[in-house]
């Protein structure tokens, strides 16, 4: 397993993009319409993979109460099925996995920690890079 990225809810996407660009991040791509809101993916120069996901949901979004701060962080898992069995054995409930692309290889789910923080679990399809990269957002 490895940490993939941290998601942050932001009140003003343009302002936040300006800030993170000034810090040194580069915009890798955007996913404008998701249940979470508009997503902007950022990475540092020299890194191959996304490290920060800015989440902008002006009306609060379907998944969040409209405040700013941590949205979630994501962990890559080798096997979603094995991970879910392991979590269940430890008394940790997970949402039913979904597949963003409709395949059986690319699966995601969420668990909630004791303080209410969301952790996204991601199983990449075979051959996918070890993180989100520019290839995930063709221009």
Locate each region found by the language model.
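Core segments of cupin and vicinal oxygen chelate
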Residues: 2, 9-49
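Vicinal oxygen chelate
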Residues: 2-12, 30, 40-44, 62-139, ...
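Short, charged/polar, Gly/Pro-enriched secondary-structure boundary elements
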Residues: 47-51, 116-119
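A short local loop/turn or secondary-structure capping micro-motif enriched for an aromatic residue
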Residues: 59-63, 127-130
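Generic beta-structure capping elements
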Residues: 45-47, 55-57, 124
């Amino acid at each position: 397993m490895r940490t993939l990225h941290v998601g942050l809810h932001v009140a003003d996407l343009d302002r936040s993009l300006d800030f993170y660009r000034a810090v040194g991040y580069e915009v890798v791509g955007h996913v404008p319409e998701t249940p979470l809101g508009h997503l902007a993916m950022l990475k540092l120069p020299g890194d191959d993979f996304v490290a920060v996901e800015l989440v902008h949901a002006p009306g609060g979004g379907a998944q969040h109460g409209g405040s700013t701060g941590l949205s979630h962080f994501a962990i890559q898992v080798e096997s979603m099925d094995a991970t879910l069995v392991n979590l269940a054995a430890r008394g940790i409930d997970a949402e039913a996995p979904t597949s963003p692309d409709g395949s059986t290889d690319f699966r995601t789910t969420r668990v909630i920690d004791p303080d209410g923080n969301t952790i996204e679990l991601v199983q990449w399809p075979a051959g996918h890079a070890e993180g989100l990269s520019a290839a995930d957002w063709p221009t």
